[in-house]
Amino acid sequence: LHLLSRRQRQMCIRDSLGGALLLGTYFLFAQKQPVDYVNPLMGTDSKISLSNGNTYPAIALPWGMNFWMPQTGKMGDGWAYTYASDKIRGFKQTHQPSPWINDYGQFSIMPMTGRLRIDQEQRACWFSHKAEKATPYYYSVYLSEYNLTTEIAPTERCAYFRFTFPETKDAYIVIDAFDRGSYVKVIPEENKIVGYTTRNSGGVPRNFKNY
């Protein structure tokens, strides 16, 4: 039987603890990917007067056909999301390169409870950044007035939405295609919604439509 001295036992314990800490640190960092360090909200504290920030929190895959974003600005406003805002008007599909060039082929989706409100001013809902999570691959926010949570995950061409409503019979989803030339049709028997938006900021063909 080989007996270790007190000094040797202390060294073995220290080495074991050191190895465990290193292993734990490795697994902690191994779980994170580079995309997890991206904060889409950076640069969104935009001010038109200074032309600073001028970004929006894109929820999208690299080179995705469409980007998605929470919308705090009015319909057609190039500054569609500003960090200082406290109301969300919808969740928008966007192709916007900059606020000055503005957007094209956009539409928005807005869930709500209670009384149905179509107008963008009336349907706008309070939210807090404390109840908002933004990453390039996942977005969620709690809409306090409607007591519901919206979640978005992008795909190459579209996005998955999940709305968690409270128990109520008065739950709605408003689809806003912005312009009068746009078209939306609900087909209940097929669980399908089809349509297109004609919204643009110029430089498109006369028959432009985003289906």
Give the ranges of each region predicted by the language model:
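Single conserved hydrophobic/aromatic residue that forms the stacking wall/gate
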Residues: 1-15
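Accessory carbohydrate-recognition regions in carbohydrate-active enzymes
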Residues: 31-211
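N-terminal export/ancillary region detector
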Residues: 21-22
